[in-house]
């Protein structure tokens, strides 16, 4: 059974905790995880790239010069895609909110649980106890990570009320600070170590113990 390393931020004590439930006992399936990552990244795209087509470019629609007798190649108007400053043929246009890759809820949950289970099996899951910052302190945040022995990149999941801790850790370049619902499969795979505060860990496991 996978275990998480528990570190007490107040006393510096270390312990281990068994990880139970579907969050940590799901077999990772690479094809499902791949689909989830692609869907997540597609959902973050804004799809706002826009180019002007021939009809949207300013300019006359008149033929530039006569068809015959000039010795030059025949040409149409100045808005032709072949000319500098002309319209773009087949260029990108803004797309609607339903555009992009989709994944159903069951697959998304299986991918998330599989990625989390893989981190737990590798021993790269940590729970941080007694994370109480009276005021933001990046120095103390860096010292805590050093005492824990974690190396970046680190994904730190905090509860929404742990504001001082979030302000302390977010200045560290190797740490990505997110809320309980602010990360997905992509962030789990990108991080070397995943650290949960005790409150964030409680939110993660709530309602999933029975599957």
Curated annotation (Swiss-Prot):
This is Large ribosomal subunit protein uL4. Residues 10-28 have a biased composition (Basic and acidic residues). GO terms for biological process: translation. One of the primary rRNA binding proteins, this protein initially binds near the 5'-end of the 23S rRNA. It is important during the early stages of 50S assembly. It makes multiple contacts with different domains of the 23S rRNA in the assembled 50S subunit and ribosome. Forms part of the polypeptide exit tunnel. Part of the 50S ribosomal subunit. One of its GO terms (cellular component) is ribosome. GO terms for molecular function: rRNA binding; structural constituent of ribosome. NCBIfam families: rplD_bact. Belongs to the universal ribosomal protein uL4 family. Residues 1-28, 48-99 are annotated as: Disordered. Keywords: Ribonucleoprotein, Ribosomal protein, RNA-binding, rRNA-binding. HAMAP family: Ribosomal_uL4_B. The keyword Ribonucleoprotein applies.
């Amino acid at each position: 059974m996978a275990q998480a390393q528990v570190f007490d931020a107040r006393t510096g004590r270390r312990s281990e905790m068994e990880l139970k439930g579907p969050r940590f006992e799901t077999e990772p399936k690479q094809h499902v995880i791949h689909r989830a990552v692609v869907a997540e990244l597609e959902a973050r795209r804004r799809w706002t790239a826009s180019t002007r087509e021939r009809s949207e470019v300013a300019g006359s629609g008149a033929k530039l010069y006569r068809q015959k007798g000039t010795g030059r190649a025949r040409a149409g108007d100045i808005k032709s895609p072949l000319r500098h400053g002309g319209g773009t043929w087949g260029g990108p246009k803004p797309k609607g909110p339903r555009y992009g890759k989709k994944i159903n809820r069951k697959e998304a949950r299986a991918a998330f649980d599989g990625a989390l289970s893989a981190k737990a099996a590798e021993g790269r899951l940590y729970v941080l106890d007694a994370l109480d910052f009276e005021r933001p302190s990046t120095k103390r945040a860096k010292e805590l990570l050093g005492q824990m022995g974690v190396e970046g990149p680190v994904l730190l999941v905090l509860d929404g009320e742990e504001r001082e801790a979030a302000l302390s850790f977010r200045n560290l370049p190797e740490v990505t600070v997110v809320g309980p619902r602010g990360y997905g499969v992509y962030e789990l795979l990108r991080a070397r170590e995943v650290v949960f505060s005790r409150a964030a860990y409680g939110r993660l496991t709530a309602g999933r113990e029975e599957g």
